[in-house]
UniProtKB/Swiss-Prot annotation:
GO BP terms in the entry: cell division; proteolysis involved in protein catabolic process
Species of provenance: Halothermothrix orenii (strain H 168 / OCM 544 / DSM 9562)
Recorded name of the encoding gene: clpX
Residues given in the record as Zn(2+) binding sites: C13, C16, C35, C38
Classification via InterPro entries: AAA+_ATPase, ATP-dep_Clp_protease_ClpX, ATPase_AAA_core, Clp_ATPase_C, Clp_protease_ATP-bd_su_ClpX, ClpX_bact, P-loop_NTPase, Znf_CppX_C4
Name this protein carries in UniProt: ATP-dependent Clp protease ATP-binding subunit ClpX
Amino acid sequence: MFKFGDEKGQLKCSFCGKSQEQVRKLVAGPGVYICDECIELCNEIIEEELNDDVEFNLNNIPKPREIKKILDQYVVGQERAKKSLSVAVYNHYKRVNSDMKIDDVELQKSNILMVGPTGCGKTLLAQTLARILDVPFAITDATSLTEAGYVGEDVENILLKLIQAADYDIEKAERGIIYIDEIDKIARKSENPSITRDVSGEGVQQALLKILEGTVASVPPQGGRKHPHQEFIQIDTTNILFIAGGAFDGLDKIIKSRIDNKVMGFGADIKSKTEENVGETLKYILPEDLLRYGLIPEFIGRLPVIVTLNELVEEDLVKILTEPRNALVKQYKKFFEMDNVELEFTPEALTAIAQKALERNTGARGLRAVVEEAILDIMYDLPSEPGIAKCVITPEVIKNHKNPELIRVKDKEETA
């Protein structure tokens, strides 16, 4: 058994055995003593282990199949898009983990452009990827950006959002993901270079080039415009993954017109396929189509990985309501469960919700609004109504704002 004191009665550290006189401090615990030197050593060991845990290395990068498997839990459909993103993200972080040069082969940066209709899951895919990889993530809207010197946000402000998401840990931020939404809104107004200044279109594309490619950017710590007498945060964007997304309304017509010009060979076959829907047409996208849409060649070159997403149909929306881990129906059931009420949506009610969202042309993001409108009154009254055991949502509740079927505790006991 360890002695806490020597023959003279002096107290000793229970870990290193040094006496009270040999150390600066001796901290007492229940039946144990520890000196300041041992405390310092313990802190160093813990700090090293924490640093080892957060260090990003190849062994910690999930494989493409693993990434897609997690994406499947949150995003319904879009199989090809999920595969493409899984591979692109895996390759990006392999490049980050290497020295970007392997046997004199330079690994170039592969930013991603996501093209798909409104509400098809572009933002959700980017958010989920960041969660899987446990890296800082920031979303910005391209429509708020303007060329330096004009009213609006400088492009450097998108980096500030990432730095804030990383709690101002610059090293961590330099390996994060930035999602730029509404990227199609900064297309220039015409295919030909403009004589007049296009401060929110081509000007922004030009301003984004360096950041997308990789540069050491100076970011104002408080955001807003730069001025000469302020301090800046320096951040290297070389290893930041940029994902740009947009609906690109009208791009399908540009693709169709290109395909329609090919009247021979495989052209006729492709044409028949593209008549199906916008998502099918977008599969045949080429950089030249984006050029005609209004993106400048240099900007297209900085987004080499193009991922297209399909339009969501009724069946997809019903699955989105019920299948993902964060599905709306599961969330509302949980809320009702907290009031000891069982919530049930009939299959016909789910179809009615999907149809209403499609009518509004809002995609998956419109589902919550439809459900909220339909069950707002019952969510308001239910907590004050004792004795209700079950609430059944029927198509009439969704379509005509009728009251849901309420089953009280007594009725449930009688039918049991």
